[in-house]
Amino acid sequence: MQSMHDRRHPTARASRIRRFRVVAAATVAAGGLLISAAMVAGSAMAVGYPAPGGIYAPFTDCPLHDPEMRLAEPGFAMGCIKSVTASGSFSVNGIPVPITQPVTVQFGTYSDTDSNGNQVFHVVPTQDHKVLLTEPEVIPGGFFLLVCLSGDPSVARLCDTAMTNGQTDLEVQVELAGEITNFGPLNLTPFTLPVKVKLTNPMLGGKCYIGSDDDPILLNPMFNPVGTLNFQTDPDPVRFPNVAVLSITGSTLTDDTFSVPAATGCGPGEVANAPINAFLGLPSPSGNNHLVLMNNDALFADDFANGDQARDLLDAFQASR
């Protein structure tokens, strides 16, 4: 419901809505950068609560029940982000790995101010803390290319077994390798998404990775170019005047800044580390690697109320069912 101040001063509410649009647009733009994740299995909202509907239907995993979401300062952005990328590629030293599976990220966010009065955004993971989960990309003959073409005698037995058993394909899967950092509302400023890449083949064992939690690949993707902006207010503007969903669709994101560490844990006694690193040229410095993410759609459900924003947004979700 409008405040007495808004009724007496209609320009105040108009100004507040304009601020909502500007900051929300910047925030969802930043959220759109978080694209190296896949659809999270399981729903935080679904644990004891029906899924939201209408314009809020995409946000079933938003952790609105997490107490941390109530730490937002009054009048500052608080809400839910979901970002989906349809396709792309990840190249190391000119060797590309296609991204053919849709990738999704979704999390909660709130903002407050630091000791210098600057607005700071915080990331709140879903209830199951699976902020990043990707579908594996299958590379036919990938194990043979990475490991066996080297002719390294130390992997000859592995290669013979793989060829005999028809196990020469390779699965490549991106996993989260730490906390998202430097997240903020500036759509031209990338934030940092730490990842590691798991290489899976029966000959490699279950711990073959490029990058690790201690030495991750630090992705800093940026819009290039930004897609189409759309703004949807809540269907009940009297009850929820500060709640809306902003979307940016059809964006492309790129990053050429990240370095790629060497492979570790590959094969018995890690004998496959050396041929994998030699084939890919690992470790690979910044400037030699390239990430392209295409057809990215980012959504941001946000609340700028001056009270309990998380409660207000949750009420809007529940009213949409």
Task: For every predicted segment, state its role.
Residues V47-R321:
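Extracytosolic secretory-pathway proteins
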Residues M1-A46:
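Secretory targeting and sorting signals
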